[in-house]
Design a protein with these regions (language model features):
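Basic, Lys/Arg-enriched alpha-helical interface segments
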Residues: 1-86, 95-99, 107-133
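A short, basic-hydrophobic beta/loop patch
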Residues: 102
Length: 133
Protein backbone atom coordinates (compact mmCIF):
# COMPACT_ATOMS: atom_id res chain seq x y z
CA UNK A 1 0.00 0.00 0.00
CA UNK A 2 1.52 3.32 -0.96
CA UNK A 3 1.53 6.51 1.11
CA UNK A 4 -1.44 8.10 -0.66
CA UNK A 5 -3.59 4.97 -0.38
CA UNK A 6 -2.80 4.63 3.32
CA UNK A 7 -3.52 8.29 4.03
CA UNK A 8 -6.76 8.10 2.05
CA UNK A 9 -7.93 5.02 3.97
CA UNK A 10 -7.03 6.58 7.33
CA UNK A 11 -8.76 9.85 6.50
CA UNK A 12 -11.83 8.04 5.20
CA UNK A 13 -12.17 5.94 8.34
CA UNK A 14 -11.55 8.81 10.74
CA UNK A 15 -14.04 11.04 8.90
CA UNK A 16 -16.69 8.37 8.47
CA UNK A 17 -16.48 7.16 12.06
CA UNK A 18 -16.69 10.67 13.49
CA UNK A 19 -13.67 9.98 15.67
CA UNK A 20 -12.32 13.23 17.00
CA UNK A 21 -8.55 13.32 16.65
CA UNK A 22 -5.67 15.71 16.61
CA UNK A 23 -4.78 16.73 13.06
CA UNK A 24 -1.29 15.22 13.45
CA UNK A 25 -2.57 11.71 14.23
CA UNK A 26 -2.85 10.55 10.59
CA UNK A 27 0.75 11.70 10.08
CA UNK A 28 1.85 9.73 13.15
CA UNK A 29 0.22 6.60 11.80
CA UNK A 30 1.55 7.21 8.31
CA UNK A 31 5.13 7.47 9.55
CA UNK A 32 4.73 4.29 11.63
CA UNK A 33 3.11 2.22 8.91
CA UNK A 34 4.47 3.45 5.59
CA UNK A 35 6.35 0.73 3.72
CA UNK A 36 6.00 -1.64 6.68
CA UNK A 37 3.90 -4.26 4.96
CA UNK A 38 1.44 -4.25 7.87
CA UNK A 39 -0.72 -1.34 6.76
CA UNK A 40 -3.82 -3.35 5.86
CA UNK A 41 -3.58 -5.57 8.95
CA UNK A 42 -3.18 -2.58 11.23
CA UNK A 43 -6.10 -0.72 9.66
CA UNK A 44 -8.31 -3.80 10.02
CA UNK A 45 -7.39 -4.14 13.71
CA UNK A 46 -7.79 -0.39 14.32
CA UNK A 47 -11.26 -0.31 12.73
CA UNK A 48 -12.29 -3.42 14.67
CA UNK A 49 -11.21 -1.90 17.98
CA UNK A 50 -12.98 1.40 17.31
CA UNK A 51 -16.17 -0.44 16.38
CA UNK A 52 -15.88 -2.54 19.53
CA UNK A 53 -15.50 0.63 21.62
CA UNK A 54 -18.63 2.11 20.02
CA UNK A 55 -20.68 -1.03 20.67
CA UNK A 56 -19.51 -1.57 24.26
CA UNK A 57 -19.33 2.05 25.33
CA UNK A 58 -16.60 3.71 27.34
CA UNK A 59 -17.03 1.91 30.66
CA UNK A 60 -17.03 -1.61 29.24
CA UNK A 61 -14.47 -1.04 26.50
CA UNK A 62 -11.93 0.40 28.92
CA UNK A 63 -12.14 -2.78 30.99
CA UNK A 64 -10.62 -4.71 28.07
CA UNK A 65 -6.92 -5.54 28.19
CA UNK A 66 -6.17 -3.34 25.15
CA UNK A 67 -7.04 -0.22 27.13
CA UNK A 68 -4.89 1.24 29.88
CA UNK A 69 -5.37 4.30 32.03
CA UNK A 70 -2.13 6.26 32.14
CA UNK A 71 -3.14 9.00 34.59
CA UNK A 72 -6.13 11.20 35.47
CA UNK A 73 -6.65 12.32 31.86
CA UNK A 74 -4.71 10.10 29.52
CA UNK A 75 -5.46 6.60 28.25
CA UNK A 76 -3.66 4.20 25.95
CA UNK A 77 -5.13 1.97 23.28
CA UNK A 78 -2.84 -0.98 22.54
CA UNK A 79 -3.09 -2.32 19.02
CA UNK A 80 -0.89 -5.32 18.44
CA UNK A 81 -0.65 -8.39 16.31
CA UNK A 82 1.92 -10.68 17.89
CA UNK A 83 5.38 -9.72 16.73
CA UNK A 84 4.09 -7.88 13.65
CA UNK A 85 3.23 -4.62 15.37
CA UNK A 86 2.84 -3.06 18.79
CA UNK A 87 1.35 0.39 18.34
CA UNK A 88 -0.13 2.58 21.05
CA UNK A 89 -2.58 5.40 20.51
CA UNK A 90 -2.85 7.83 23.40
CA UNK A 91 -6.21 9.49 23.90
CA UNK A 92 -8.12 11.61 26.38
CA UNK A 93 -11.58 13.03 26.92
CA UNK A 94 -12.15 16.70 26.24
CA UNK A 95 -12.55 18.58 29.53
CA UNK A 96 -15.56 20.55 28.26
CA UNK A 97 -17.35 18.30 25.77
CA UNK A 98 -16.33 14.90 27.17
CA UNK A 99 -15.64 13.72 23.65
CA UNK A 100 -12.88 11.13 23.19
CA UNK A 101 -9.88 12.55 21.31
CA UNK A 102 -7.19 10.40 19.71
CA UNK A 103 -4.00 12.35 20.28
CA UNK A 104 -0.79 10.54 19.38
CA UNK A 105 0.34 7.21 17.96
CA UNK A 106 3.70 5.62 18.59
CA UNK A 107 5.48 2.32 18.27
CA UNK A 108 6.10 0.89 21.73
CA UNK A 109 9.47 -0.78 21.98
CA UNK A 110 10.22 -0.12 25.66
CA UNK A 111 8.33 1.35 28.58
CA UNK A 112 10.53 4.49 28.26
CA UNK A 113 8.83 5.18 24.92
CA UNK A 114 5.84 6.43 26.90
CA UNK A 115 7.67 9.41 28.38
CA UNK A 116 8.03 11.41 25.19
CA UNK A 117 4.70 10.15 23.82
CA UNK A 118 2.85 11.40 26.90
CA UNK A 119 4.44 14.84 26.53
CA UNK A 120 3.34 14.98 22.87
CA UNK A 121 -0.19 13.84 23.76
CA UNK A 122 -0.58 16.49 26.48
CA UNK A 123 0.71 19.25 24.20
CA UNK A 124 -1.84 18.23 21.58
CA UNK A 125 -4.65 17.97 24.12
CA UNK A 126 -3.84 21.46 25.40
CA UNK A 127 -3.89 22.80 21.83
CA UNK A 128 -7.31 21.31 21.19
CA UNK A 129 -8.80 22.45 24.47
CA UNK A 130 -7.46 25.99 24.07
CA UNK A 131 -9.13 26.14 20.66
CA UNK A 132 -12.54 25.50 22.25
CA UNK A 133 -12.29 28.20 24.90
Amino acid sequence: MNKDQLLHMLDAFLSQSGLYHHEALPGDLLSLLRKSGIEAEFLKEFVKMQSQYDVLGRAQAEQLSQYERIDDRLYSLHIDKGRKFNIRILYAYHSVTGQRILLHAFWEHRSRDYESAIAVAYARLNDLEEDTL
